């Protein structure tokens, strides 16, 4: 089995990584890192390759959606055939927030699988909120409670979510190490890694005014798409999730395999 490096490039400047605290001194690096919090793990052995402020609280921005994916996947049995209607009341909640959006529209009828792709590939806050509203039976706060319950179940020690998308809130935080625990679990779920490694996602709404009309979405992850930024593209990287806003800075969770490691 090839050994996988698990760089969670999180919390400020891009091109750093994260992982668990125990044994963090196992490896030394000969370059300076600039991210505020980092954890890098070998997934085959759970060996810590490097860590920096891995237990410090940080806002995770859209890497929050990894937990949103987990909760949705565990609450909905049939992702491909469960359909959700997008309502004006839900999407209007994001007006004026500067959100990243997938472009879903009022009265679209989409499958949960389509919404998960819309959430993870272009980092659509709109898709995240629609899913949370649907599973929470009109109350996204009920969905957020499920997110926090799952974080505790996974052993997260310093994580608290207040929304399903990652917009700024002083009480919305996690750590590099907790985000590692969350992502490692997400990678065990069906569809997660395949969805997160896409550079493009094309779909057609199953119902609504634009039913059958094709739409194509583009990843926000510059590590995996050479067309976005050749200088940041890293051909050994796979997925997973970007995030950014003024308070969080630039966040990234990713994996990479090179030379058998």
Write out the residue ranges for each language-model feature.
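Active-site-adjacent loops and short helices of periplasmic peptidoglycan-processing enzymes
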Residues: 23-177, 186-190
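Intrinsically disordered, low-complexity sequence elements enriched in Ser/Thr/Gly/Pro
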Residues: 1-2, 56
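Hydrophobic alpha-helical segments, especially transmembrane helices
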Residues: 3-5, 66, 242, 258
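Penicillin-recognizing serine hydrolase domain
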Residues: 31-36, 136-261
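Sec-dependent N-terminal signal peptides of Gram-positive bacterial secreted proteins and lipoproteins
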Residues: 2-24
């Amino acid at each position: 089995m090839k050994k996988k490096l698990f760089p969670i490039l999180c919390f400020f400047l891009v091109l750093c990584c994260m992982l668990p605290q125990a044994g963090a001194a196992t490896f030394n690096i000969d370059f300076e890192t600039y991210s505020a919090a980092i954890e890098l793990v070998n997934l085959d052995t759970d060996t810590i390759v490097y860590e920096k402020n891995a237990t410090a609280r940080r806002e995770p921005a859209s890497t929050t959606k990894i937990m949103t994916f987990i909760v949705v996947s565990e609450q909905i049995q049939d992702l491909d055939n469960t359909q959700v209607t997008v309502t004006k009341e839900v999407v209007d909640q994001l007006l004026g927030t500067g959100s990243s959006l997938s472009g879903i529209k009022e009265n679209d009828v989409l499958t949960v699988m389509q919404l998960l792709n819309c959430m993870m590939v272009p980092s659509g806050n709109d898709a995240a909120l629609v899913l949370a509203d649907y599973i929470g039976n009109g109350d996204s706060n009920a969905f957020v409670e499920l997110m926090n319950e799952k974080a505790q179940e996974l052993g997260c020690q310093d994580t608290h979510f207040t929304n399903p998308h990652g917009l700024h809130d002083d009480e919305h935080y996690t750590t590099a190490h907790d985000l590692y625990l969350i992502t490692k679990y997400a990678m065990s779920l069906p569809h997660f890694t395949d969805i997160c490694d896409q550079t493009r996602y094309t779909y057609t709404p199953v119902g609504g005014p634009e039913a059958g009309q094709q739409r194509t979405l583009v990843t926000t992850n510059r590590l995996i798409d050479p067309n976005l930024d050749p200088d940041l593209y890293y051909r050994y990287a796979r997925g997973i999730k970007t995030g950014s806003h003024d308070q969080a800075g630039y966040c990234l969770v990713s994996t990479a395999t090179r030379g058998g490691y």
